[in-house]
Amino acid sequence: RVDLENKLVSLCIKNLQNDLRNILNSKLILIEQNNNDASYCSKIDKLSGKIDFTKESTREIFQKFKAFVGWPGLYFEKNNTPIKIHGLKEYNGNKEALKENNFRFIEEGIAVKTSDSVLVITHLQFPGRRIISASDAVNSHAKFFEN
Protein backbone atom coordinates (compact mmCIF):
# COMPACT_ATOMS: atom_id res chain seq x y z
CA ARG A 1 0.00 0.00 0.00
CA VAL A 2 2.82 2.41 0.85
CA ASP A 3 4.68 1.55 -2.38
CA LEU A 4 1.57 2.26 -4.43
CA GLU A 5 1.04 5.54 -2.60
CA ASN A 6 4.66 6.61 -3.26
CA LYS A 7 4.38 5.74 -6.96
CA LEU A 8 1.16 7.71 -7.30
CA VAL A 9 2.65 10.73 -5.53
CA SER A 10 5.68 10.79 -7.86
CA LEU A 11 3.43 10.48 -10.94
CA CYS A 12 1.24 13.32 -9.68
CA ILE A 13 4.26 15.55 -9.12
CA LYS A 14 5.49 14.97 -12.68
CA ASN A 15 2.05 15.61 -14.17
CA LEU A 16 1.50 18.67 -12.01
CA GLN A 17 4.76 20.20 -13.23
CA ASN A 18 3.75 19.63 -16.86
CA ASP A 19 0.24 20.97 -16.29
CA LEU A 20 1.50 24.12 -14.56
CA ARG A 21 3.96 24.71 -17.40
CA ASN A 22 1.14 24.30 -19.95
CA ILE A 23 -1.14 26.67 -18.02
CA LEU A 24 1.57 29.33 -17.89
CA ASN A 25 2.23 28.95 -21.63
CA SER A 26 -1.52 28.90 -22.47
CA LYS A 27 -1.16 25.50 -24.15
CA LEU A 28 -4.08 23.80 -22.41
CA ILE A 29 -7.24 23.16 -24.41
CA LEU A 30 -10.30 23.21 -22.20
CA ILE A 31 -12.94 20.59 -22.96
CA GLU A 32 -16.35 20.92 -21.39
CA GLN A 33 -17.54 17.87 -19.46
CA ASN A 34 -20.26 15.75 -21.01
CA ASN A 35 -22.69 15.37 -18.10
CA ASN A 36 -24.26 12.29 -19.73
CA ASP A 37 -20.98 10.43 -19.24
CA ALA A 38 -20.51 11.61 -15.65
CA SER A 39 -21.21 9.26 -12.76
CA TYR A 40 -22.22 10.00 -9.20
CA CYS A 41 -20.89 8.46 -6.03
CA SER A 42 -22.75 8.94 -2.79
CA LYS A 43 -20.93 10.62 0.06
CA ILE A 44 -18.93 8.25 2.24
CA ASP A 45 -19.69 8.69 5.92
CA LYS A 46 -18.92 6.75 9.09
CA LEU A 47 -21.98 4.52 8.60
CA SER A 48 -20.60 3.38 5.23
CA GLY A 49 -18.13 1.20 7.13
CA LYS A 50 -20.78 -0.65 9.15
CA ILE A 51 -21.32 -4.26 8.13
CA ASP A 52 -23.97 -6.83 8.92
CA PHE A 53 -22.54 -10.33 8.62
CA THR A 54 -25.98 -11.88 8.17
CA LYS A 55 -26.88 -9.68 5.19
CA GLU A 56 -23.58 -9.18 3.36
CA SER A 57 -21.52 -11.69 1.42
CA THR A 58 -17.89 -12.42 2.13
CA ARG A 59 -16.94 -10.76 -1.16
CA GLU A 60 -18.88 -7.58 -0.33
CA ILE A 61 -17.25 -7.39 3.10
CA PHE A 62 -13.73 -7.83 1.65
CA GLN A 63 -14.45 -5.12 -0.93
CA LYS A 64 -15.63 -2.73 1.78
CA PHE A 65 -12.58 -3.60 3.87
CA LYS A 66 -10.26 -2.65 1.00
CA ALA A 67 -12.25 0.45 0.05
CA PHE A 68 -12.55 1.90 3.54
CA VAL A 69 -8.98 1.35 4.80
CA GLY A 70 -8.11 4.28 7.05
CA TRP A 71 -11.42 6.10 7.00
CA PRO A 72 -14.16 5.33 7.80
CA GLY A 73 -12.79 1.85 8.43
CA LEU A 74 -14.87 -1.28 8.76
CA TYR A 75 -16.82 -2.15 11.88
CA PHE A 76 -19.65 -4.31 13.18
CA GLU A 77 -21.82 -4.11 16.25
CA LYS A 78 -22.04 -6.84 18.85
CA ASN A 79 -24.02 -6.31 22.07
CA ASN A 80 -24.50 -2.65 21.01
CA THR A 81 -20.72 -2.16 20.94
CA PRO A 82 -19.04 -1.02 17.70
CA ILE A 83 -15.93 -3.10 16.99
CA LYS A 84 -13.50 -1.98 14.27
CA ILE A 85 -11.96 -4.60 12.02
CA HIS A 86 -8.26 -4.11 11.24
CA GLY A 87 -7.46 -7.48 9.67
CA LEU A 88 -9.44 -9.98 7.57
CA LYS A 89 -8.63 -13.14 5.67
CA GLU A 90 -10.39 -16.01 3.95
CA TYR A 91 -11.55 -19.01 5.96
CA ASN A 92 -10.48 -22.43 4.66
CA GLY A 93 -11.95 -24.66 7.36
CA ASN A 94 -15.27 -26.43 7.89
CA LYS A 95 -18.01 -23.88 7.26
CA GLU A 96 -20.70 -26.19 8.65
CA ALA A 97 -19.25 -25.90 12.17
CA LEU A 98 -20.43 -22.28 12.35
CA LYS A 99 -24.14 -22.89 11.76
CA GLU A 100 -25.15 -22.48 15.40
CA ASN A 101 -22.80 -19.69 16.44
CA ASN A 102 -21.92 -16.70 14.26
CA PHE A 103 -18.53 -16.21 15.96
CA ARG A 104 -16.03 -18.94 16.67
CA PHE A 105 -12.48 -18.66 17.95
CA ILE A 106 -10.01 -20.58 15.79
CA GLU A 107 -6.23 -20.62 15.56
CA GLU A 108 -6.05 -17.92 12.84
CA GLY A 109 -8.54 -15.55 14.51
CA ILE A 110 -12.28 -15.18 14.92
CA ALA A 111 -14.27 -17.07 12.29
CA VAL A 112 -17.46 -15.21 11.39
CA LYS A 113 -20.39 -16.56 9.40
CA THR A 114 -21.46 -14.23 6.58
CA SER A 115 -24.56 -14.46 4.39
CA ASP A 116 -22.84 -16.90 2.03
CA SER A 117 -19.63 -18.16 3.61
CA VAL A 118 -17.16 -17.60 6.45
CA LEU A 119 -14.29 -15.14 6.94
CA VAL A 120 -11.69 -14.68 9.67
CA ILE A 121 -11.09 -11.50 11.65
CA THR A 122 -7.39 -11.39 12.54
CA HIS A 123 -7.19 -7.97 14.26
CA LEU A 124 -9.86 -5.83 15.88
CA GLN A 125 -10.35 -2.81 18.10
CA PHE A 126 -12.85 -2.18 20.86
CA PRO A 127 -13.96 1.46 21.47
CA GLY A 128 -11.28 3.51 23.20
CA ARG A 129 -8.80 0.63 23.14
CA ARG A 130 -5.77 -0.25 21.06
CA ILE A 131 -5.81 -2.68 18.13
CA ILE A 132 -5.47 -6.28 19.33
CA SER A 133 -5.00 -9.61 17.61
CA ALA A 134 -7.88 -12.04 17.61
CA SER A 135 -5.87 -14.34 19.87
CA ASP A 136 -5.73 -11.55 22.46
CA ALA A 137 -9.49 -11.12 22.07
CA VAL A 138 -9.90 -14.83 22.83
CA ASN A 139 -8.09 -14.33 26.13
CA SER A 140 -9.77 -11.09 27.19
CA HIS A 141 -13.22 -11.01 25.53
CA ALA A 142 -14.27 -14.64 24.98
CA LYS A 143 -17.62 -14.27 26.77
CA PHE A 144 -18.38 -11.11 24.79
CA PHE A 145 -18.60 -13.11 21.55
CA GLU A 146 -20.88 -15.82 22.90
CA ASN A 147 -24.44 -15.63 21.53
Regions found by a protein language model. Name each.
Residues 1-91:
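Active-site-proximal loop/hinge segments within enzyme catalytic domains
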Residues 52-147:
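An anion-binding loop in the catalytic cleft
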